Every structure is written in C-alpha cells, then in structure tokens.
Regions:
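Short, charged, amphipathic alpha-helical segments
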Residues: 31-39
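Amphipathic alpha-helical binding modules
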Residues: 54-88
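Extended, non-membrane alpha-helical segments enriched in charged/polar residues
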Residues: 20, 39-42
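Short terminal alpha-helical segments
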Residues: 1-30, 82-83
Length: 88
C-alpha cells in the first residue's frame, strides 16, 4: 500500500471518529468544542482532495486538547503524514 493510500484510508477512519465525537458532544458525552471538531472535519475532507493545504487543526489540538487525548494524537499524526504526501 502506497503512502497516499495509507493516508487516504487513515483520513477516512479519522473523519468517522471525528463525526462520532461530534455526536458524543451533541449527546452531552464529550466536552470537546463542536466548532473545533467541525473545523477539523472540514479540513480532513479538504486534505483528501488537495495537496499542500495549510491546515490549522494541529494547532487547535495542541493548544486546547489534553496532550494524551488519543483522537488528538491520531489527528496530529495524520497531519504529519499529509505533509509527507504533499511533497510528492
């Protein structure tokens, strides 16, 4: 599986996780910001289509989420993969 294929697969997986987190916020089961989650979801979707975007969500996560949040860690890792994929 190529780097781009791995990135795309992980992106789709994380979009599903972010959507599930938005649902948890709506149900009162999560205290994350719905606005932040929606921004992240939009950027993830854009990242599938366009290489080289300047994405803001890693800064959002680093600045305001718990450093050990597993979803946050996965999202920041995906941003790093995106940088690598965008170089090609």
């Amino acid at each position: 599986m190529s780097l781009e294929e791995k990135f795309y697969k992980k992106n789709v997986e994380l979009q599903n996780k972010v959507s599930a987190e938005i649902q948890k916020v709506n149900e009162g089961l999560s205290e994350k910001s719905i606005a932040q989650l929606q921004t992240i979801l939009k950027e993830l979707d854009s990242m599938k289509e366009v290489k080289g975007l300047i994405i803001s969500y890693p800064r959002i996560i680093i600045d305001s989420w718990d450093y050990s949040d597993s979803l946050g860690l996965e999202l920041v890792e995906l941003a790093e993969q995106y940088k690598k994929v965008s170089k090609y």
